[in-house]
């Protein structure tokens, strides 16, 4: 089958592959076409970095799928950033990178603005202007990411299955915004969501403040069936 590999320069390479090919094999094919050594290649599909020993089938890569090729800098290193949800992000960095640079890389991967990020290493909060070298952060070190909410608050959303979702919101957020956050976490389209608080169904254009929803309030999520009324 054919797949496509898109580089950061916007160039697209076409490769002939089998679903049983490993990621190593694919990197070798890219080397044959483009001359880029496999150890400088990082391949991304559906937001995930692909591991060398796995196959295209493992990642459900079908014909005409597009992979993204990112170059791994020589002299660079990888570090890990662990979030409070337990998710671990891998970043390619240099020891000379500042903490600001690292926060920008996290924003690129996760969409979290730098001014909402606090990074902790060895129990210390890291200051923006300092470098990784200043804090003796070596390859494969793990930083911890804590979110700094701007006047924000947390609320809970309980589903009919009994699952509770935690959301970071502002009192000025509209019900539409909240439904979009639920979609981001749970994949449920906003038009299938009905939110209930204090026995009332919440209307899209209104804000949390309109309904006097405070921090740590619990909303109830009911699904609106497709084709329903």
Swiss-Prot record:
Gene3D superfamilies: Phosphatidylinositol 3-kinase Catalytic Subunit, Chain A, domain 1 (3.10.20.90)
GO cellular component: cytoplasm; nucleus
Pfam families noted in UniProt: ubiquitin (PF00240)
CDD domains: Ubl_ubiquitin
Compartment(s): Cytoplasm; Nucleus
UniProt crosslink position (Glycyl lysine isopeptide (Gly-Lys) (interchain with K-? in acceptor proteins)): 76
Disulfide bridge map: none
PROSITE patterns documented for this protein: UBIQUITIN_1, UBIQUITIN_2
All copies of domain Ubiquitin-like, residue ranges: 1-76, 77-152, 153-228
InterPro entries: Ubiquitin-like_dom, Ubiquitin-like_domsf, Ubiquitin_CS, Ubiquitin_dom, Ubiquitin_ubiquitin-like
Propeptide segment residues: 229
Covalent link Glycyl lysine isopeptide (Lys-Gly) (interchain with G-Cter in ubiquitin), residues: 48
Keywords: Cytoplasm, Isopeptide bond, Nucleus, Repeat, Ubl conjugation
Entry's family note: Belongs to the ubiquitin family.
Misc remark: For the sake of clarity sequence features are annotated only for the first chain, and are not repeated for each of the following chains.
Physiological role: Ubiquitin exists either covalently attached to another protein, or free (unanchored). When covalently bound, it is conjugated to target proteins via an isopeptide bond either as a monomer (monoubiquitin), a polymer linked via different Lys residues of the ubiquitin (polyubiquitin chains) or a linear polymer linked via the initiator Met of the ubiquitin (linear polyubiquitin chains). Polyubiquitin chains, when attached to a target protein, have different functions depending on the Lys residue of the ubiquitin that is linked: Lys-48-linked is involved in protein degradation via the proteasome.
Protein name as catalogued: Polyubiquitin
Organism listed in the record: Euplotes eurystomus
């Amino acid at each position: 089958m054919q797949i496509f590999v898109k580089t950061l320069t916007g160039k697209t390479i076409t490769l002939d592959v089998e679903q049983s090919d490993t990621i190593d094999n694919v990197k070798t094919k890219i080397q044959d076409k483009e001359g880029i050594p496999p150890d400088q290649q990082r391949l991304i599909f559906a937001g995930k970095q692909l591991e060398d020993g796995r196959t295209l089938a493992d990642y459900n890569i079908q014909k005409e799928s597009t992979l993204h090729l990112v170059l791994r800098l020589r002299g660079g290193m990888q570090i890990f950033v662990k979030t409070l949800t337990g998710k671990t992000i891998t970043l390619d960095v240099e020891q000379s990178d500042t903490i600001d640079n690292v926060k920008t890389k996290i924003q690129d991967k996760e969409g979290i603005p730098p001014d909402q990020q606090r990074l902790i290493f060895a129990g210390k909060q890291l200051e923006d202007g300092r470098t990784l070298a200043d804090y003796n952060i070596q390859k494969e070190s793990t930083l911890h990411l804590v979110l700094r909410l701007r006047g924000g608050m947390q609320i809970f959303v309980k589903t009919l299955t009994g699952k509770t979702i935690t959301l970071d919101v502002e009192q000025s957020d509209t019900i539409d915004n909240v439904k979009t956050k639920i979609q981001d976490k749970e994949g449920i389209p906003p038009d299938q969501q009905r939110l209930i608080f204090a026995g009332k169904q919440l209307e899209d254009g209104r804000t949390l403040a309109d309904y006097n929803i405070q921090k740590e309030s619990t909303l109830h999520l009911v699904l609106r069936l497709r084709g329903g009324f």
